[in-house]
Amino acid sequence: MGPDTTSERVSEDLMQAVTCLKRVMVGMKSNGTDYVQEQTPSNSTTVICTLVKITGALERCIESNKAMNDVLNGKMKCTTCGATSVGLLSDCHDSATSTTTTVSHRSSEEPPRRKPSAAGGDHDDEELECSSIESRSIRSVSSSVHTSAEDDETNQTMMVPTDVADVINAIVAGTNGSSNSNTTSSSKSPQEEEEEHDLVMKSILSTTTSTSNTKLELSEKLENPLQDTALLDQFLQASLLGQTPTVTPASEENEEDKEQNAVLTSFLQILFANQQAGNAILDAGSSENDGSTSSSQPSPPADPTASLDSLAMFESLLAESMNGNVLDANTSSADQKAAARKRKSTPMKVPKSENGAGYICPMDGCNKVFKEKGSVHRHFVTHIGMRFNCDKCKASYTQKHALMLHQKIHANPDAYQCRGCGTNYTTQNGLRLHRQRNPACMEVSNALEFNTSLNTSISEALSGPLSKNSSPTKQMVSAP
C-alpha cells in the first residue's frame, strides 16, 4: 500500500486474484484429492466450495468497485442519500464508520452452533461453512477498510488496499480456522449482507473523497512558481568568477525594458573590464616583486581613478540615453506638428475650373477662381483660421508675405508715415491709399506739403540776391 494507489489498480489486482483462484479450482477439481490430503486433512469438496465462495466474494468486490467508480464519475446515485456528487457522499462517512465498528464487533463474536441433521448432514455442513466463509470474508474486508479510513484521517493520505495478497491471506486464514474447527455458523439474511456491503462501500467513498481533497491542496501548494532570478544569478556568477556578464533579456519584454537591460549590460561590461584591468596590474606587480629580490621598494598601488572613470562613463551613458530619448521625442513631436500644419494649410487637391482657365478653391461654399495655384494656397489659409503673428507687436496676418512687409515698418518706421495721423506704411502705395480713404489726413498732408514747398522757395529767393550783391563789392575792393 502506498500513495500511488488508485481504484483502477485495485480492480486490476482483484481480477488477477480471481483468475488465479479459478485456475486453482480447476486444478483441484482434476486431481485435488492427493493435494488436499497432503496439505490439510479437510475434505476436498469443502475446500472447493470455500474457493468458489471466495471467488464470488472477490467478483462482488470488483463489481462494487466499478459501481464506486461510476458514483465518483457522477454516473450512478448513492443507495443511501441518492446524491450523484462525490462531495455529497462524504456526509455518509460518520454513519458508515459507526456501523462498520458494530459489524467488526459482531465478526469477533463466536457464531451460534447448530446440530447437524442425520439426513444430508454433509451437504448442510458444506452450505453452512460456505455461507460463514462468505460473511467472514466480507467482514474482514470491511474491517480492513475501516482501519484504512482511520489511518487516512490521521495521515491525510489515501490508503486503499491494493495489495490483494493481504486480503486473500486473511480470507484463507479464516477458511483454515473454519476447516480445523468442526463448528458451523448460522447464515445471515441477504438483506443484512447487502447492508454490510453498502456500509463498506460508503467508507471507501469517504476515504477517497478526503484524500482527493488533500491531493488537490498539496498540488496547489507545489505549483506556486518561483520568481525569475536569472539576471541576479548571472551577475553573482560573473562577479565571483571574474567573467564578463551576458544579460539575456526575455523574448516578450517591452522596448523600455530592453533599453534598460542594454544600459545595464554596458555598465556591467565597463565595470568588469576595469576590474580585470586592475587585477592584471596587481598580478604584474606581484610577478615583478617575485622575480627581482634586490628591489626593496613596494609596487605602486592601483590607480584609484579607474572606478571613478567607470562611474563617470556610466553616468555619461545614462545622460546620453536620456537626452537622446528626449531629443527624439521633441524632434518627432515638432515634425508631426509641422506636417500637420502643412497638411492643414495646403489643400489635398486643387481642382481646375470648368473651362480650364484657372483654379477653384476646394473649400465647400467658396467658388472663387484664381489664375495660379499658389494663389489658391494663400487663399485657402483664410478658411482654416491660421494667422501669422508679429513678434514685436500685436499685429497678425492671414498671409506670410503680409507679415514680412509689416516687419519692414519696425526696421524703418519713418519711411512712409502719414503726417496727419502718424500711421506708418511699408509702401508708398499704402500711404497713398490711406490718404484717399481719409480726407482729413489728405488735407493735413497737402497743407504740410504746401508749407514745405513755400519755405524752400523763400529760402531759395533769399539766398539768390545775397550772392549777387556780394560779388561786385569784392570786385570793387579788389580793383586797384
UniProtKB/Swiss-Prot annotation:
Third 'degenerate' zinc-finger domain essential for function. A zinc finger (C2H2-type) spans 359-383, 388-410, 416-441. One of its GO terms (molecular function) is zinc ion binding. Changing residue 441 to Y: In ot280; expression of the dopamine transporter dat-1 abolished in the PDE mechanosensory neurons forming the posterior deirid ('postdeirid') sensillum. Ectopic formation of CEPV mechanosensory neurons. The keyword Flavoprotein does not apply. SMART domains: ZnF_C2H2. InterPro entries: Znf_C2H2_sf (IPR036236), Znf_C2H2_type (IPR013087). Probable transcription factor, involved in regulation of dopamine neuron lineage specification. May play a role in maintaining robustness of the Wnt/beta-catenin asymmetry pathway. One of its GO terms (biological process) is asymmetric stem cell division. Keywords: Metal-binding, Repeat, Transcription, Transcription regulation, Zinc, Zinc-finger. Residues 95-105, 131-145, 174-187, 286-296 have a biased composition (Low complexity). It comes from the Eukaryota. Residues 92-160, 174-198, 282-307, 328-351, 461-480 are annotated as: Disordered. This is Zinc finger protein ztf-6. One of its GO terms (cellular component) is chromosome.
